[in-house]
Swiss-Prot record:
Pfam family, one: CYYR1
Protein name in the entry: Cysteine and tyrosine-rich protein 1
Membrane topology: Single-pass type I membrane protein
Tree of life domain: Eukaryota
Organism, as annotated: Rattus norvegicus
Biased composition, class Polar residues, residue ranges: 153-165
Keyword Disulfide bond among record annotations: no
InterPro entries for the chain: CYYR1
Family: Belongs to the CYYR1 family.
Cytoplasmic domain ranges by topology: 83-165
Localization per Swiss-Prot or TrEMBL: Membrane
Region feature (Disordered): 127-165
Extracellular-side segments: 30-61
Main location: membrane
Length: 165
């Protein structure tokens, strides 16, 4: 019985397509006052391209808004996915924000902390270095070390004469 209905539906569809092509010849996009900028020289009855009109509408602000919306939706999806993964990982059906204090302490401190004493802080260290004593003067026969490369120190005229000799 369904096999007999199929050709009838096909015939109705075919008839509608034929009517569409017959009457579509008179349907032309006229270049009115609002559309004149997007038509070919304003003389043809058909507008050249609706893509030019859409391209004008999709300015930088609209494109930025679309990109922001897509990124925002991706962030929401990622947040939901993370929430679902965390809930599935726990296998206890823990709701977001409902965590017991004992559970938090078990995460932070897996075992008891070591005892804290002040002994090492209050002890006076007896191994201090010896008090400062000035080193003996070096002999005057040693020459001073050479200057570092790129030394930008200005020399006096007497030093320049010594260096030039």
């Amino acid at each position: 019985m369904d096999a007999l209905r199929l050709p009838r539906r096909l015939g109705v569809l075919l008839w509608k397509v034929v009517l569409l092509f017959v009457y579509a010849e008179d349907c032309r996009a006229q270049c009115g006052k609002d559309c004149r900028a997007y038509c070919c020289n304003g003389s043809t009855p058909h507008c050249c391209s609706y893509y030019a009109y859409i391209g004008s509408i999709l300015s930088g602000t609209a494109i930025a808004g679309i990109v922001f919306g897509i990124v925002f939706i991706m962030g929401v999806i990622a947040g939901i996915a993370i929430c679902i993964c965390m809930c599935m990982k726990n296998n206890r059906g823990t709701r977001v924000g409902v965590i017991r204090a004992a559970h938090i302490n078990a995460i932070s401190y897996p075992m008891a902390p070591p005892p804290y004493t002040y002994d090492h802080e209050t002890e006076y260290c007896t191994d201090l270095p010896p008090p400062y004593s000035p080193a003996p003067q070096a002999s005057a026969q040693r020459s001073p070390p050479p200057p570092y490369p790129g030394n930008s120190r200005k020399y006096s005229s007497s030093q320049n004469r010594i260096c030039n000799n």
